[in-house]
Curated annotation (Swiss-Prot):
It comes from Pectobacterium atrosepticum (strain SCRI 1043 / ATCC BAA-672) (Erwinia carotovora subsp. atroseptica). GO terms for cellular component: cytosol. It is an enzyme of class 2 (transferase). Keywords: ATP-binding, Cytoplasm, Glycolysis, Kinase, Nucleotide-binding, Transferase. It catalyses: D-glucose + ATP = D-glucose 6-phosphate + ADP + H(+). This is Glucokinase. It comes from the Bacteria. One of its GO terms (molecular function) is D-glucose binding. The keyword Transferase applies. The lineage of its organism: Bacteria, Pseudomonadati, Pseudomonadota, Gammaproteobacteria, Enterobacterales. It is found in: Cytoplasm. The gene is glk.
Length: 321
């Protein structure tokens, strides 16, 4: 009889829930809920299980906020809960709550090559550290290391490190953003709002008034080559993505690969392919040669968070990934 576990991927807007085969990791009965439809995460979970008349003993939920103890309070949603209390209320044997990029990183060891698109470098070295990052509403970051026959995710808040300008143009952007933001983190440039920040800073640097554009407006104008400021902004976004990914690679020597997740890059994939991303990734001065063999992949799988939550829980339950 198939042993199903519950997995979830909770963002600021939507919550995705699914059943996962504890032996194979196969996902089934994926459903997306609006976060506005339920007063609590537990309410969404109960609705999912009750509508299917299914009982589970084990669950893993990936959630877009720091997980530092028993109390979880989402930064971009009103939901908040005690892990221990929800575990008891749902009658679960195992209830794992992990950061969303912990889940994405845990998907890497079980993800097929058909779900990856490579941007330069050689082949990944088995067992070597991995870096995962992705721009969306914010900038998520995690590393993954292989220790004692298990994969261990190293989550953190790497998107909030200082933005490191490395050209005259980037210096100008940093100066302008600092005037309005104070501390300028990498996320202030590598996110949906970050793309808007780059565009505005480019226009302001020429003493002009920027338009009130959304990220999708900037992307469309850049891809269609109808606005030089938008094209400059998106080009610089790609370069900064490369620089930031290169920094992650240097931190742990990620010869297992650097993996890009998040919803932004797939929206302008052809533009990204032709951009200065890879050159910026390798642009580490004396360590350029070190960088050249490190592969970078774009994750194209539709549900890496659910896949990774399943992989994390399966490993907790004793399976080898």
């Amino acid at each position: 009889m198939t042993h199903f576990v519950l997995v979830g991927d909770v963002g600021g807007t939507n919550t995705r829930l699914a059943l996962c085969d504890a032996m194979t990791g196969e996902l089934s009965q994926i459903e997306t809920y609006s976060g506005l439809d339920f007063p609590s995460l537990e309410g969404a979970i109960r609705d999912y299980l009750d509508s299917r008349q299914v009982t589970v003993q084990d669950a893993c939920i990936a959630i877009a906020c720091p997980i530092t103890g028993d109390w979880v309070a989402m930064t971009n949603h009103t939901w908040a809960f005690s892990i221990a209390e929800m575990k008891a209320s749902l009658g679960l044997r195992h209830f794992e709550v992990i950061n969303d990029f912990t889940a994405v990183s845990m998907a890497v060891p079980v993800m097929g090559r058909e779900s990856l698109l490579q941007f330069g470098g050689g082949e990944p070295v088995p067992g070597k550290p991995v870096a995962v990052y992705g721009a969306g509403t914010g900038l998520g970051v995690a590393h993954l290391v292989h220790v004692a026959n298990q994969w261990v995710s190293l989550p953190g808040e790497g998107g909030h490190v200082d933005f490191a300008a490395n050209s005259d143009e980037e210096d100008n952007i940093l100066t302008i953003l600092r005037q309005s933001l104070g501390h300028v983190s990498a996320e202030r440039l590598l996110s949906g709002q970050g793309l808007v920040n780059i565009y505005r800073a480019i226009v302001l640097s020429d003493d002009r008034t920027p338009e009130a554009l959304e990220p999708k407006d900037i992307t469309e104008r850049a891809v269609n080559n109808t606005d030089v400021d938008c094209r400059r902004a998106l080009s610089l976004f790609c370069v900064i993505m490369g620089r930031f990914g290169g920094n992650l690679a240097l931190n742990l020597g990620t010869f297992g690969g650097v993996y890009i997740a998040g919803g932004i890059v797939p929206r302008f994939l052809e533009f990204f392919k032709a951009s200065g991303f890879r050159a910026a990734f390798e642009d580490k001065g004396r360590f350029k040669g070190y960088m050249q063999d490190i592969p970078v992949y774009l994750i194209t799988h539709e549900q890496p968070g659910l896949m990774g939550a399943g992989a994390y829980l399966r490993q907790v339950l004793g399976s080898a990934l």
